[in-house]
Amino acid sequence: MQLQLICEDAALQPYLDAIASKWQLTHDAHSHFALVLTFERLELRKLDEPKLGAIYVDLAGGAVAHRRKFGGGKGQAIAKAAGLNKGATPTVLDGTAGLGRDAFVLASLGCKVQMVERNPVVAALLDDGLTRAKKDDEIGAWVSERMSLLHASSHDALAALASDAEFVHPDVVYLDPMYPHPENKKKTALVKKEMRVFQSLVGADTDADALLTPALALATKRVVVKRPDYAEWLDGVKPSMAIETKKNRFDVYVNASMS
């Protein structure tokens, strides 16, 4: 993928070169998007809209830390959807990892989470955030133990893993495809910013319907699909049950009981 690759300090250039090589990113001086390496972190910026600010992954602080501490634990909707309220601590494959927030919530509640992200820029941001989180005194130990990242398209990876005799199937496959956002729907400033940047960089997941069948083949217990409250069912398939919040809905497709 091509975008501007910028270092805030020349001393960081070898590190940025390594990131570009790892994620197959090439510099394009004319791109409106820039991946910027600072001394603190890796950031994505939309240069033609500087007021949007930088997008980066911070699993140790900010809103993510607040949600971990005060978000409701196993009683919150995502935990119920994944079956944690049944007394289980399932293994999870997050097929649309994005910036890793939902995966982090599940990991903070004890789940081992394998994250899959197909966009190389998003994967680079997530990898950087994960690396920093693993060094954090408070959360580093369990993040290292429970969270891992695979850079691949779930459209390929889910089917490939399902047919791999040596791969241990996860209890739960979690999907949160990017969905076109109607202008008349309100979002928080942060989500609005991220959606604007991501949808112009990545585009909506117009092929998301094709994820459900391989996800059901891979998950031993259930597939959880996060949808906006106004969205139709993934691939038009009615879920076994749905858990609703103010703005979202978790559609749950049950393969087997959690016990």
From Swiss-Prot:
Disulphide connectivity of cysteines: none
Gene Ontology cellular-component terms listed: cytoplasm
Keywords: Cytoplasm, Methyltransferase, rRNA processing, S-adenosyl-L-methionine, Transferase
Domain of life the protein comes from: Bacteria
InterPro entries, alphabetized: 16SrRNA_methylTrfase_J, SAM-dependent_MTases_sf
EC number(s) given by UniProt: 2.1.1.242
Binding site for S-adenosyl-L-methionine: 101-102, 117-118, 153-154, 176
Coiled-coil region: none
Reaction catalyzed: guanosine(1516) in 16S rRNA + S-adenosyl-L-methionine = N(2)-methylguanosine(1516) in 16S rRNA + S-adenosyl-L-homocysteine + H(+)
GO MF term list: rRNA (guanine-N2-)-methyltransferase activity
Compartment(s) of residence: Cytoplasm
Similarity comment text for this entry: Belongs to the methyltransferase superfamily. RsmJ family.
Function per UniProt: Specifically methylates the guanosine in position 1516 of 16S rRNA.
Name of the featured protein: Ribosomal RNA small subunit methyltransferase J
Organism: Vibrio vulnificus (strain YJ016)
Taxon lineage: Bacteria, Pseudomonadati, Pseudomonadota, Gammaproteobacteria, Vibrionales
